[in-house]
């Protein structure tokens, strides 16, 4: 008995259907098209901030465009990357320092970094540590956030 796993990913008006059986994919799309007006964009290239690259062994997901958009949004396109992770012993104070002027920017940037941990898991510790200061971020915490962009 052949077991197959058909994946149908739906987000708002984007649908991605995949399976190893091309005929099954075509049938599902045909069935969906009876109820909904579908427009095929061909093979998956970009979905929810992820670029998809098909290889001989499977599918590789990256977030290169998402990272670049984040660099542009935070005016960090001219800086060199900092490969050093945040030390577990590094102390960030929740009460000391100048309050960061744009708490919304801090929160949005931290959300974007959280999303990036899906494809860049080695920043997870640092991002989670810096997420502790969402309520009232300071300038020094913001500068620490900029290391990971």
Regions found by a protein language model. Name each.
Residues 1-149:
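Long, low-complexity, charge-biased intrinsically disordered regions
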């Amino acid at each position: 008995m052949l077991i197959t796993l058909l994946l149908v990913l739906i987000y708002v008006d984007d649908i991605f259907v995949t399976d190893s059986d091309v005929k099954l994919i075509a049938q599902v799309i045909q069935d969906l098209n009876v109820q909904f007006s579908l427009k095929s964009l061909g093979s998956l290239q970009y979905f929810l901030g992820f670029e998809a690259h098909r290889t001989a062994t499977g599918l590789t997901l990256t977030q290169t465009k998402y990272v670049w958009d984040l660099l542009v949004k935070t005016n960090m396109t001219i800086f060199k990357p900092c490969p050093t992770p945040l030390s577990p012993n590094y102390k960030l104070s929740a009460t000391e320092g100048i309050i960061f002027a744009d708490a919304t920017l801090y929160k949005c940037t931290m959300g974007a970094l959280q999303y990036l941990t899906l494809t860049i898991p080695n920043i997870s510790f640092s991002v989670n540590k810096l997420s502790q200061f969402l309520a009232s971020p300071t300038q020094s915490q913001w500068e620490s956030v900029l290391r990971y962009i």
